Regions:
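Nucleotidyltransferase catalytic core that binds NTPs
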Residues: 1-195
Length: 195
């Protein structure tokens, strides 16, 4: 059965870790399409550059990755970005067999997500490994959510330990970021003085 992966994030900015994850997801034979979905107003974040800039950077950072397309669906929804609302919207638009891609850190805290139980009924979860998350803790969280009907696959994808937050801090210190960002994204950030 072919599936559509939902890869959401703030992408503030998109970096090589995101690209690594997308390439790994694209290599999964059952994945037909990957919707890269920038968040409109992340409920837990406030220091975010405009949606227009983040979409432009995503287009540059992820161009050429098989099966990927930038989706503006979440950006066009009213109010704050909640995964459950986005999944309901995608279902109405005919997206069947969605797979929500999240990090191991998110799985461990998934019960804190807004209407998480409803999310579990709407989408399968693909989980990529994250530095600092013990495998035993990850497997325990997986088991607990599966008791609630979740379908969860732990991917053998271990992205580089890089975060958008660290990149923004590094910009403030004028550190070299050539190894963390695609060259055209770095140029775009500098041209628009985003961070």
């Amino acid at each position: 059965m072919k599936k559509t992966a939902i890869f959401g994030g703030t992408f503030n900015p998109p970096h090589i870790g995101h690209r690594f994850m997308l390439e790994g997801i694209a290599s999964q034979p059952e994945i037909e399409k990957i919707l890269i979905m920038p968040a409109k107003i992340p409920p837990h974040k406030s220091d975010v550059v405009s949606a227009e800039h983040r979409v432009n950077m995503c287009k540059m950072a992820f161009c050429g990755i098989e099966k990927c397309e930038i989706s503006l669906e979440e950006l066009n929804l009213p109010g704050k970005s909640y995964t459950v609302n986005t999944l309901h919207h995608l279902n109405k638009k005919g997206i069947k067999n969605p797979v929500l891609v999240i990090g191991a850190d998110s799985l461990v805290n998934f019960y804190k997500w807004y209407r998480y139980d409803e999310i579990l009924s709407l989408a399968e979860l693909y989980v990529y490994k994250r530095e600092g998350i013990d495998v035993a803790i990850l497997l325990s969280a997986k088991k607990e959510l599966e008791k609630q009907g979740a379908k969860i696959t732990i991917l053998d994808i271990y992205p580089p330990a890089v975060s958008s937050t660290d990149i923004r801090v590094a910009f403030g210190k004028a550190e070299n970021l050539k190894t963390l960002l695609e060259p055209n994204v770095l140029k775009y950030i500098n041209e628009h003085s985003l961070y």
